[in-house]
Amino acid sequence: MKISKESVRRKAFRFALITSALMAIPMSSLADIAVKDGEKIAFLGDSITQAGARPNGYVRLAIRGLESAGVKTTAIPAGISGHKSNQMLARLERDVLSKKPNWMTLSCGVNDVWHGKRGVSLEDYKVNITRIVDHCQSAGVKVMILTSTMIGEDKGNANNKKLSTYNDFLRELAREKKCLLADLNADMR
């Protein structure tokens, strides 16, 4: 089954709104993870995150969503096109931790998979992502993990099948490390 580009855009927009709302809701079960007024949010990722820093990208939409809920935050855009988990780990200190965020969203996986032989194996991906989360949590940064969206519009292509194992790991890691999870891939399976 093919999914249109417009459908993917709607899902990304919906994600930004849901993410910002979820991060702002001061419910008792979320009280210890809700974004507070004045906090900084780093957005670590690849080209999707880099484009998210544009005026109508998901980084700006999330910040505007929080503002509409009365929560003023500062964005730290840290997306670089083409980057994989190993590159994000290598620049984590410089691009994220040195800026002392309270929160970090992590969007990583598409390039690890679809770059083929230049990609990152599932085993190495698990090590890289776990280290990123561990470094952030050791620095007192709360982490929201985003599962990766589809590669192309065909759910059944080989890359999407491979990506599903990476996303399964992210879901498992979020539970294990008590990270917030935005399961962007849930509706695309």
PLM feature spans:
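Alpha-helical cap/lid subdomain in secreted, periplasmic
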Residues: V35-D37, R60-T74, Q87-R189
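Glycine-/small-residue-rich active-site loops that bind phosphorylated ligands and cofactors
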Residues: Q50, K84, V113
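Short beta->alpha junction loops
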Residues: P77-K84
